[in-house]
A protein has these predicted regions:
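N-terminal, polar/charged subdomain of small-to-medium soluble alpha/beta proteins
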Residues: 1-89, 104-148
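A charged helix-plus-loop insertion that forms the helical arch/lid used to bind
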Residues: 86-98
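Acidic/glycine-rich phosphate/pyrophosphate-binding loops and surrounding catalytic core
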Residues: 101
Length: 148
């Protein structure tokens, strides 16, 4: 599982010009589910993101986690993160999990965050979405569950 975590002061997802999810302070997570991702990948990703100290404390030092700040998550499925661009000029998505399995893993990921008490909203799986955010910092992190 590949996740791009972007610290934000606000983020929202729209489908057909209608806002479907919106958060204030927290993280926008773009998530790509790869073939072979399992419950352990979800656990590692949730563990890392929920405890990652990437929010400023009162001294301006990155020292607080999403749990500490009581921030929100906006989780958006993005299979293009699994794209392979090594050969040719068009990405190959053979490493992306099937839509049906990806949906289950995506929903499970969000539920795991909710079980920790983190307000977690999502995009609309499989839909063409417009994602907007105000990136704070900017602070953007790449998390690959296979490297944790």
């Amino acid at each position: 599982m590949i996740t791009i975590a972007q610290r934000c002061s606000s983020a929202k997802v729209s489908v057909n010009k209608t806002i479907v999810s919106e958060i204030k302070s927290g993280l926008l997570l773009l998530v790509g589910v790869q073939i072979g991702d399992k419950q352990i990948d979800i656990k590692k990703t949730v563990d890392k993101i929920s405890n990652l100290r990437i929010f400023d404390d009162e001294k301006g030092k990155m020292n607080l986690s999403i749990l500490d700040t009581k921030g929100s998550l906006l989780v958006v499925s993005q299979f293009t993160l699994c794209g392979d661009i090594k050969k040719g000029r068009r990405p190959s998505f053979v490493n992306a999990e099937s839509p049906s399995l990806s949906l289950k893993i995506y929903e499970n990921l969000m539920e795991n965050f909710r079980q920790l008490g983190i307000k977690t909203l999502g995009g609309v799986f499989g839909e063409m979405m417009k994602v907007e955010l105000v990136n704070e910092g900017p602070a953007t992190f790449i998390i690959n569950s296979k490297e944790l």
